[in-house]
């Protein structure tokens, strides 16, 4: 081989290194999660080469074995106290959930995520004293296992751990009440080769602030730019990312690698959570990072994981109904919209293969029942409390349903989640089973997939606050 060919190959290799592949968050807070082997095949067929997990479920990690997919395995916040207080517990966790899967199953575990957004202000400091000790003990356990060159620790943090005293990125620093702790953690990560992992959500800014400029959430350059001393920011992502970069620089860690642990846009549950906006945001983000341009303060490739891969119908809706609709795929692995991930697909996501469904039948309201029947309201409240009614209401995919259709949707959600048990469609004299699909327009009345019993398929109980049930019940009528 001539020198010209060698140089060409080196150039191609360097180019590939600069164009970081996109990853995806794979959450499993679902009443009926897809079998892990089906999800892994879907990941591979869509060219998704990195996956971020929120736990270390055995079957999930086994399915990822020999796939070549890079894995970030997660430790839930609820485990931090135990791992912080016991090095032995940390060693057992690493042995069971990291070492074994690497040596026996050939899983490409590259990171351990210790906790998930543990310093959110809404947690009221619950994990302030346990996060760093847990992080330290897991790192010690990784070193004892001889995996420190392959597996790095990190701690996914919400973007609220830093802010700006000037409202501009250049004023970025860590939040005053946790600044010392953040510097301790960042220093520890830096010493051990771990990245700073941050979750950035322009959608949340739009959801929580009615005055937030919509165009600034996207990447098409239509927003009024933010002028930070001659550096112009045309979208919120760049401004937020560079606020973190300035915070790191200000505290002596300007070269620390950054991973975007979560970024995405939901498709339902709110007027701004829809297919058009989700496609616009996610495709815009992919185009924004595809050339390795980076941000004004930190040029270069951006390492990121889309949030999320699949919808999760058992997630808490405390933040909002949209929480169950972040997936680029539906709960059963159907693509929601065209999306070019810059991998092996050309804009058409490939659906999950081998998905097995329950029988094609639905639970609906009997046509002769009146809306003011005294049995209706309590039945709907019950169905929504144990089902998923987050697609009902103003601005949602099922917003155009009439009263009876809304009630039918609630009944069917409960019926499907209960695996179509006969008793799950026995609302007193007001419900019946039909084999005629009641779906209409943008509103899909789902048929549930067969339950998966290989792992902790039903360990996540539904959390649907009564106030939210009441709010949906009001919107139905």
Swiss-Prot record:
Lipidated positions per record (GPI-anchor amidated glycine): 455
Enzyme class: hydrolase
Catalytic reactions of this protein: Hydrolysis of (1->3)-beta-D-glucosidic linkages in (1->3)-beta-D-glucans
GO cellular component term of the entry, any: plastid
Membrane topology term: Lipid-anchor; GPI-anchor
Keyword Disulfide bond (UniProt): yes
GO biological process, one term: defense response
Annotated glycosylation sites: 97, 124, 406, 429
Post-translational modification, as annotated: Contains two additional disulfide bonds.
Proregion positions: 456-477
EC number: 3.2.1.39
GO-annotated molecular function: glucan endo-1,3-beta-D-glucosidase activity
Subcellular location: Cell membrane
Signal peptide: 1-21
Disulphide bridges: 363-425
Keywords: Cell membrane, Disulfide bond, Glycoprotein, Glycosidase, GPI-anchor, Hydrolase, Lipoprotein, Membrane, Plant defense, Signal
Coiled-coil intervals, chain numbering: none
Top-level taxonomic group: Eukaryota
UniProt xrefs under Pfam families: Glyco_hydro_17, X8
Active site residues according to the UniProt entry: 117 (proton donor), 262 (nucleophile)
Sequence similarity: Belongs to the glycosyl hydrolase 17 family.
Protein name as annotated: Glucan endo-1,3-beta-glucosidase 6
Native source organism of the sequence: Arabidopsis thaliana (Mouse-ear cress)
């Amino acid at each position: 081989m001539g020198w010209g060919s060698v140089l060409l190959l080196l150039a191609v290799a360097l180019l590939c290194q600069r164009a970081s592949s996109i990853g995806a968050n794979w959450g499993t807070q679902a009443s009926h999660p897809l079998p892990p082997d089906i999800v892994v095949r879907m990941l591979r067929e869509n060219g998704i080469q990195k996956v971020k997990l929120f736990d270390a479920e055995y079957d999930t990690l086994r399915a990822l074995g020999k796939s070549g997919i890079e894995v970030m395995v997660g430790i839930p916040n609820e485990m931090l106290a135990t791992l912080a207080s016991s090095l032995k517990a940390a060693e057992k966790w690493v042995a069971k959930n990291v070492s074994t899967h690497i040596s026996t199953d050939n899983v490409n575990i590259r990171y351990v995520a210790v906790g998930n957004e543990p310093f959110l202000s809404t947690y009221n400091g619950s994990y302030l004293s346990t996060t760093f000790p847990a992080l330290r003990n897991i790192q010690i356990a990784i070193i004892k296992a001889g995996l420190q060159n392959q597996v790095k620790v990190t701690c996914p943090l919400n973007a609220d751990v830093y802010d700006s005293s000037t409202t501009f990125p250049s004023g970025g620093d860590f939040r005053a009440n946790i600044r010392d702790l953040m510097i301790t953690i960042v220093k520890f990560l830096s010493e051990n080769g771990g990245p700073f992992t941050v979750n950035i959500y322009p959608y949340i800014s739009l959801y929580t602030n009615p005055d937030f400029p919509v165009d600034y959430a996207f990447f098409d350059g239509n927003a009024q730019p933010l002028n930070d001393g001659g550096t112009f920011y045309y979208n919120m992502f760049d401004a937020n990312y560079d606020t973190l970069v300035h915070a790191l620089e200000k505290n002596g860690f300007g070269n620390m690698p950054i991973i975007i642990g979560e970024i995405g846009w939901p498709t339902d549950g709110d007027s701004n959570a829809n297919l058009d906006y989700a496609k616009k945001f996610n495709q815009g983000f992919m185009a924004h990072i595809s050339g390795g341009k980076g941000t004004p303060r930190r040029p270069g490739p951006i390492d990121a994981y889309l949030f999320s891969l699949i919808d999760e119908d058992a997630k808490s809706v405390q933040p909002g109904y949209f929480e169950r609709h972040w997936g680029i795929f539906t709960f059963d692995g159907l693509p929601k919209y065209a999306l070019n991930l810059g991998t092996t697909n050309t804009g058409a996501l490939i659906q999950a293969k081998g998905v097995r469904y329950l029988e094609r039948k639905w639970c609906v309201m009997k046509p002769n029942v009146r809306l003011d029947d005294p049995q209706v309201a309590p039945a709907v409240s019950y169905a929504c409390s144990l089902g998923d009614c987050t697609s009902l209401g103003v601005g949602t995919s099922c917003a155009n349903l009439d009263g009876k259709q809304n009630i039918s949707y609630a009944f069917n959600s409960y019926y499907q989640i209960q695996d179509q048990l006969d008793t799950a469609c026995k609302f007193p004299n007001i419900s019946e089973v039909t084999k005629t699909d009641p779906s209409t327009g943008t509103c899909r009345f789902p048929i549930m997939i067969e339950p998966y019993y290989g792992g902790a398929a039903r360990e996540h109980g539904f959390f649907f606050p009564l106030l939210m049930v009441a709010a949906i019940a009001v919107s139905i009528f």
